[in-house]
């Protein structure tokens, strides 16, 4: 029953349970379905669901995967074991570990978590304590620099030695900001990851507990992991190396916030014994869209080669309009929408996609 409805590539990914596994999943190729069915298959072999860990990036993705996994386990489980897999975001996993073990640097297990508003306010306070005006020194811009450098495992001292004056300032603010967090027994989102990897790499008890508790590790959207998340995944895999990562180098869009595409491109260097499965069948788009996507993305030389295909219909041709400026683009889109509505198309059947930045 677990393999019903899966294509051959998905079945291979589901049935490959031991050792490192790289699932290269093209857009719309059913990656979540594959991971969920893989979890169910592992449980069907006699492994407790509580020994399975899956980590993704957003609360929405974690919630969807958890709900689908629980539903499938209810249908397929042939044991009295009613435990569930641990499915969370990287940050939620960090909170869990730090509250259980405390940070390696000795900070308490009870701490508050700063949201974006809190961190901005604290950086404003740091600037003011240094005699600087937050109005002329953008706290959000400074926080962005600090966050990117922290996730690259740099230090305030390294920033302060930079030739760029903005980076030198960010290094000084970072030190004051850190003192402010410590005085409040607070951690920001970056700390949840940084202190987690510190814990996993330096605390033998915590690392051994994770290895004993979670025998099978799944990491979603691996192409978007940064250096810290990469090391968390490696530490969790341990000597057993039952690490399944899912991702697609063609969908890497977060390098600006520290994501390192090398993590997925060099997975086979990290784990030479890894099995690689390509999920190339798209269940979402028409043949026209898939063909265009393949032609565009194949120009990228830094990728895992694959060729998406679909068994859906051909679909309408793609049209391209080159506007003179943003206003001309907007005018063109509005006119096309009006034409379609006048011809009987419902407004709710029209979608307009645009970049937020």
Where are these regions (language model features)?
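Residue-level signature of catalytic and energy-coupling elements of molecular machines
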Residues: 10, 28, 58, 89, ...
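P-loop NTPase Walker
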Residues: 1-109, 113, 208, 262, ...
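Conserved nucleotide-binding/hydrolysis micro-motifs of P-loop NTPases
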Residues: 29, 59-62, 91-94, 249-253, ...
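Helicase P-loop NTPase motor core
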Residues: 29-35, 272-275, 280-357
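Coupling/switch/interface segments within P-loop NTPase motor domains and analogous charged loops
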Residues: 116-181, 185
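Conserved phosphate/pyrophosphate-binding and hydrolysis machinery centered on Walker-type P-loop NTPases
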Residues: 7, 55, 87, 112-116, ...
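Short glycine-/polar-rich loops that comprise or flank the Walker A/P-loop
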Residues: 19, 47-51, 81-83, 239-242, ...
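Conserved helicase NTPase motor core
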Residues: 4-15, 19-23, 34, 53, ...
């Amino acid at each position: 029953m677990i393999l019903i409805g899966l294509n051959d590539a998905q079945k291979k990914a589901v049935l490959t349970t031991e050792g490192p596994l790289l699932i290269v999943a093209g857009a719309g190729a059913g990656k979540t379905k594959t991971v969920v069915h893989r979890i169910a298959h592992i449980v069907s072999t006699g492994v407790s669901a509580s020994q399975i860990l899956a980590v993704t990036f957003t609360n929405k993705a974690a919630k969807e995967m958890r709900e689908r996994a629980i539903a499938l386990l209810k249908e397929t489980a042939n044991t009295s074991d009613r435990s569930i897999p641990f499915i969370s975001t990287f940050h939620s996993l960090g909170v869990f570990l730090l509250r259980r073990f405390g940070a390696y640097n000795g900070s308490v297990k009870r701490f508050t978590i700063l949201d974006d508003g809190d961190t901005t306010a604290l950086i404003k306070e740091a600037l003011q304590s240094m005699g600087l005006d937050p109005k002329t020194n953008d706290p959000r811009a400074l926080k962005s620099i600090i966050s990117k450098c922290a996730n690259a495992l740099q230090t305030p001292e390294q920033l302060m030695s930079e030739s760029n004056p903005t980076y030198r300032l960010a290094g000084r603010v970072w030190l004051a900001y850190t003192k402010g967090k410590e005085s409040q027994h607070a951690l920001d989102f970056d700390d949840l990851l940084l202190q987690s990897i510190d814990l996993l790499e330096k605390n033998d008890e915590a690392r051994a507990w994770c290895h004993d508790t979670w025998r099978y590790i799944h990491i979603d959207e691996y192409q978007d992991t940064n250096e810290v998340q990469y090391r968390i995944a490696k530490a969790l895999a341990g000597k057993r190396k039952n690490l399944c990562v899912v991702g697609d180098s063609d969908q890497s869009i977060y390098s600006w916030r520290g994501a390192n595409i090398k993590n997925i491109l060099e997975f086979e260097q990290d784990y030479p014994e890894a099995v690689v499965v390509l999920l190339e069948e798209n269940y979402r788009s028409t043949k026209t869209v898939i063909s265009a996507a393949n032609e565009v993305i194949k120009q990228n030389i830094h990728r895992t080669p694959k060729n998406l295909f679909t068994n859906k219909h051909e679909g309408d041709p793609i049209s391209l309009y080159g506007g003179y400026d943003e206003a001309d683009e907007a005018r063109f889109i509005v006119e096309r929408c009006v034409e379609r509505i006048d011809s009987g198309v419902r407004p709710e059947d029209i979608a307009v996609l645009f970049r937020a930045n």
